[in-house]
């Protein structure tokens, strides 16, 4: 009788266990992808691919003049507003920002986008999602102070280091780059299964989502909930007590206001 060496047995067992885990993982991925496909067909919303990398990380998606024209057409007060900006370090994530007095909102949006290689359309979408700034007439001080919702928790004041329109816009663009460089530090990763809640109340449940790209992972790091069926069925309206709307509204605003055919490029820029 020939005895198989113990080491060989251990290796075989490990290989079999690994194969079983991979097979189970692939089955879960296929189930998540099937559910996401059904949501896309029914509600035109894919929780695993809210926006492509090519759309999100295109710092040349619009020119400053195009940003200004877009703001003008929306009828909000932001189109005519100016802000004093300051010198800010890009901290190796973005190009440094050179401040000046009386800089237009369009210039701040465009320069922040180019400095951090984040789409102007994304920045416009986020400020509309967070504070309705694109369309707001006579926005409040708080709307401007918390323009992008950056470091502005629901239960406390905004961090003074990020308060104000300029610091919110440039800071948010830089934060997205930080997330991109340090994705592994957060709970949501691309090309992987991620359990994403429907609401801050864990009792509302959630679902596994196969996140298809880095841009979508960043949106979940920034706003860590997915819309439930009630939120999706409501369109741009109100769902139920377990609904959240941040990422649904991002998709709706981006698609309705800012989507153009340049989205075909799905590369990281």
Question: Can you say where each PLM-predicted feature lies in the sequence?
Answer:
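N-terminal export signals and maturation junctions of secreted/periplasmic proteins
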Residues: 17-107
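Second-shell loop/turn segments in exported
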Residues: 91-101, 108-115, 153-162
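Catalytic and binding regions of secreted/periplasmic enzymes and modules that target cell-wall glycans
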Residues: 123-258
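Conserved small/polar residues in nucleotide/adenosyl-binding loops
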Residues: 259-266
């Amino acid at each position: 009788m020939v005895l198989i060496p113990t080491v060989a047995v251990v290796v075989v067992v490990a290989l079999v266990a690994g194969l079983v885990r991979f097979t189970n993982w692939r089955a879960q991925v296929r189930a998540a992808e099937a559910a996401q496909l059904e949501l896309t067909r029914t509600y035109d919303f894919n929780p695993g691919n809210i926006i492509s990398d090519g759309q999100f990380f295109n710092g040349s998606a619009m020119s400053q003049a195009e940003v200004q024209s877009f703001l003008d057409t929306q009828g909000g007060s932001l189109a005519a507003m100016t802000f004093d900006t300051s010198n800010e370090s890009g901290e190796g994530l973005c190009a440094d920002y050179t401040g000046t007095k009386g800089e237009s909102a369009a210039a701040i949006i465009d320069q922040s986008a180019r400095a951090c290689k984040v789409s102007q359309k994304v920045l416009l979408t986020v400020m509309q999602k967070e504070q309705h700034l694109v369309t707001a007439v006579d926005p409040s001080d708080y709307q401007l102070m918390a323009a992008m919702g950056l470091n502005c928790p629901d239960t406390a004041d905004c961090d003074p280091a990020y308060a104000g329109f300029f610091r919110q816009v440039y800071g948010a663009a830089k934060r997205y780059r930080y997330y991109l460089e340090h994705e592994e530090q957060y709970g949501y990763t691309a090309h992987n299964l991620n359990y994403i809640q429907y609401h801050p109340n864990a009792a509302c449940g959630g679902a596994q989502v196969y996140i298809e790209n880095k841009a979508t992972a960043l949106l979940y790091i920034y706003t860590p909930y997915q819309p439930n069926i009630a939120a999706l069925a409501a369109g741009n309206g109100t769902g139920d007590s377990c609904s959240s709307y941040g990422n649904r509204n991002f998709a709706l605003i981006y698609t309705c206001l800012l989507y153009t055919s340049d989205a075909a490029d799905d590369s990281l820029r």
